[in-house]
Amino acid sequence: MSRRRAAEKREVLPDAKFGDLVLAKFINSVMLQGKKAVAEKIVYGAFERIQSKTGQDPVKVFHDALDNVKPSVEVRSRRVGGATYQVPVEVRPDRRQALGLRWLIDFARKRSETTMVDRLTGEFLDAASNRGGAVKKREDTHRMADANKAFSHYRW
């Protein structure tokens, strides 16, 4: 552990179009090599596709997708007497959100559609209706935690 103070959390400004803090964090996560304008173009393009495909509010679809992807428990390795146990622990709210955003992006990038706009649109719609790779990842994480429930007394 570091002997210094914990680093201060930086303030994230809400995104320009919808004024949403979580969406701003998502855009920052999509961004590669500091190209924020490109990331905004991709995310807003996906939102326009969602609006035209479903007729629903894209911000609501985004938040529904994120809620369906956020994990509530995960396993962490704990070494006890020469053996390493996978101990289930509850996920902090800030980490829960970060994992949800990361998984949405990772599984959108792995999809087979041609453009990132199409991939993000597909992943948002799938996750909002409890399908897709990111939702499967959350379920696998929960399954791992459930399988290792016997080691929960090693929690720290």
Curated annotation (Swiss-Prot):
Name the PROSITE patterns on file.
RIBOSOMAL_S7
Describe the function of this protein: One of the primary rRNA binding proteins, it binds directly to 16S rRNA where it nucleates assembly of the head domain of the 30S subunit. Is located at the subunit interface close to the decoding center, probably blocks exit of the E-site tRNA.
Q: Which domain of life is it from?
A: Bacteria
Q: Which PANTHER family match?
A: RIBOSOMAL PROTEIN S7
* Gene Ontology process terms (BP): translation
* Gene name as annotated: rpsG
Q: What is this protein called?
A: Small ribosomal subunit protein uS7
Pfam short name (any one) = Ribosomal_S7
One GO CC annotation: small ribosomal subunit
Q: What GO molecular function terms would the record report?
A: rRNA binding; structural constituent of ribosome; tRNA binding
Report the family membership.
Belongs to the universal ribosomal protein uS7 family.
NCBIfam families in UniProt: rpsG_bact (TIGR01029)
**UniProt keywords, alphabetically:** Ribonucleoprotein, Ribosomal protein, RNA-binding, rRNA-binding, tRNA-binding
Task: Say yes or no: keyword Cell inner membrane present.
Answer: no
Organism of this sequence: Rhodospirillum rubrum (strain ATCC 11170 / ATH 1.1.1 / DSM 467 / LMG 4362 / NCIMB 8255 / S1)
Complex and partners:
Part of the 30S ribosomal subunit. Contacts proteins S9 and S11.
Q: Which SUPFAM superfamilies match?
A: Ribosomal protein S7 (SSF47973)
> What does the record give as the organism's lineage?
Bacteria, Pseudomonadati, Pseudomonadota, Alphaproteobacteria, Rhodospirillales
